[in-house]
């Protein structure tokens, strides 16, 4: 299959009049679209077997072929593709029949370049929105990434999670970055009796102690500089539901006594307001840090840890559940080629072997990112090793002993590893000890 060099959409023009094809093509290519032309139903069918199109302009009078029959076949072959019927004034009634049969719209010949451009932009926008909606609906219907597993250890964890979800016990989820701790937390909320209420997330590393207290418990107007309005806080938002404290190991030590008190008594005060309030909240927390080591070094309260880990679930790294790698890769590929309307339909044997041999330090998050990138840049039906962008990395993700690496190569490898295990660029910049603008420049420099 050919790769689209333009970034706005693939368009198929089907008309038996070469002058119309030429005029439409020049107009649309001037707008930056990728355009293919066919002068018969058979030629259109051949093109559609080789390429993925987002939009088709189909002449209703196509020589010996009936445009309505061609439309029906297109709807079967490429149900996602928007089809605009092109017709003469005398055949408007038939064009209306075509819309009832599944066409998106119709244009009356002769049409102006502005009419063609407007119709194209409108239909491609609808196509993009439909793709995003389908992706979201698929996310709702299907098991979340990494939670549909063939790994015995993962299946045992999921079974335990389902059993404890129906209780109100606090749960601590442990695991490396990218293993799906947040998804498991949201799944537990969905399996619980609190599912109809909110599941509110706080990302602990992103907030200072001062901001964390305000974000968690709320504040009154004038409580501090810039507090022009009162806020209710995440605890209030989660009342009756679940509060998920992501990366709890980064929760400010000075604020841990207030969190402990809330977990024990369900009581809290907003910043700048002495009134004691209550909230019925179930606590889920997750971290990739060793909290017991942090307790021993005085960086985390032992009594808070005991309150958080009534139930502990430890998610295995992706390399420890290798039987799920290809299943997840296939699922990600199917999702992204649908979302981006790309031609890839599977992986070559070499690519599948590379996926299995890689250690995935960034776990499921890294796998998802690798497959998303591959789905975008792959111009054919099979994803090759070169599309994955990780073929030359050694299995242990460390520089080879004795390898002559430049400082730039070392820096690139280090930044790439941090990016793979960070949820946001800000978090990656913080880990690297540089500001976001410097990280942006380095990513551009190293093509990361």
From Swiss-Prot:
The keyword Transcription applies. InterPro entries: AAA+_ATPase (IPR003593), CheY-like_superfamily (IPR011006), Homeodomain-like_sf (IPR009057), HTH_Fis (IPR002197), P-loop_NTPase (IPR027417), Sig_transdc_resp-reg_receiver (IPR001789), Sigma_54_int (IPR002078), Sigma_54_int_dom_ATP-bd_1 (IPR025662). Residues 425-444 bind DNA. ATP binds at residues 175-182, 238-247. The keyword Phosphoprotein applies. GO terms for molecular function: ATP binding; ATP hydrolysis activity; sequence-specific DNA binding. It holds the Pfam family HTH_8. One of its GO terms (biological process) is alginic acid biosynthetic process. The modification 4-aspartylphosphate is found at residue 59. CDD domains: AAA. Residues 10-124 form the Response regulatory domain. Residues 147-376 form the Sigma-54 factor interaction domain. It comes from the Bacteria. Positive regulator of the alginate biosynthetic gene algD. PANTHER family: ALGINATE BIOSYNTHESIS TRANSCRIPTIONAL REGULATORY PROTEIN ALGB, TRANSCRIPTIONAL REGULATORY PROTEIN. This is Alginate biosynthesis transcriptional regulatory protein AlgB. The lineage of its organism: Bacteria, Pseudomonadati, Pseudomonadota, Gammaproteobacteria, Pseudomonadales. The gene is algB.
């Amino acid at each position: 299959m050919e790769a689209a060099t333009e970034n706005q959409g693939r368009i198929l023009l089907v008309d038996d009049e070469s002058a119309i094809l030429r005029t439409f093509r020049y107009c649309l290519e001037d707008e930056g679209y990728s355009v293919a032309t066919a002068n018969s139903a058979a030629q259109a069918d051949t093109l559609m077997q080789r390429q993925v199109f987002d939009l088709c302009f189909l002449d209703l009078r196509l020589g010996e072929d009936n445009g309505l029959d061609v439309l029906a076949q297109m709807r079967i072959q490429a149900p996602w593709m928007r089809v605009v019927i092109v017709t003469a004034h005398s055949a408007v009634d038939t064009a209306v029949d075509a819309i009832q049969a599944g066409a998106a719209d119709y244009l009356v010949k002769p049409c102006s370049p502005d009419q063609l451009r407007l119709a194209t932009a409108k239909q491609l926008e609808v196509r993009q929105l439909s793709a995003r909606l389908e992706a979201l609906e698929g996310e709702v219907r299907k098991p979340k990434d990494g939670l549909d597993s063939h790994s015995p250890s993962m299946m045992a964890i999921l079974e335990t999670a389902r059993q404890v979800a129906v209780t109100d016990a606090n749960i601590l989820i442990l695991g490396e970055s990218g293993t799906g701790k947040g998804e498991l937390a949201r799944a537990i909320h969905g399996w619980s009796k609190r599912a109809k209420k909110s599941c509110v997330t706080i990302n602990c590393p992103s907030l200072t102690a001062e901001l964390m207290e305000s974000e968690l418990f709320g504040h009154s107007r004038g409580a501090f500089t810039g507090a022009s309005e009162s806020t209710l806080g995440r605890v209030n938002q989660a009342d009756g539901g679940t509060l998920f404290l992501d990366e709890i190991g980064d929760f400010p030590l000075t604020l841990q006594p207030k969190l402990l008190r809330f977990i024990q008594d369900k009581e809290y005060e907003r910043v700048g307001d002495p009134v004691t309030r209550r909230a019925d909240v179930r606590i889920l927390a997750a971290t990739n840090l060793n909290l017991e080591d942090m307790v021993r070094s005085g960086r985390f309260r032992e009594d808070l840890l005991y309150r958080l880990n009534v139930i502990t679930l430890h998610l295995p790294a992706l390399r420890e559940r290798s039987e799920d790698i290809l299943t997840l890769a296939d699922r990600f590929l199917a999702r992204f080629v649908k979302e981006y309307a790309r031609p890839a339909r599977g992986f070559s044997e070499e690519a599948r072997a590379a996926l299995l041999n890689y250690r995935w330090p960034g776990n499921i998050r890294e796998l998802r990112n690798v497959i998303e990138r591959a789905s975008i840049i792959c111009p054919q039906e099979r994803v090759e090793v070169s599309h994955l962008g990780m073929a030359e990395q050694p299995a242990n993700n460390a520089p080879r002993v004795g390898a002559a690496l430049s400082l730039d190569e070392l820096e690139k490898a280090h930044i790439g590893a941090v990016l793979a295990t960070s949820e946001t660029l800000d978090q990656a910049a913080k880990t690297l000890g540089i500001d976001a603008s410097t990280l942006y420049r380095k990513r551009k420099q190293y093509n990361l």
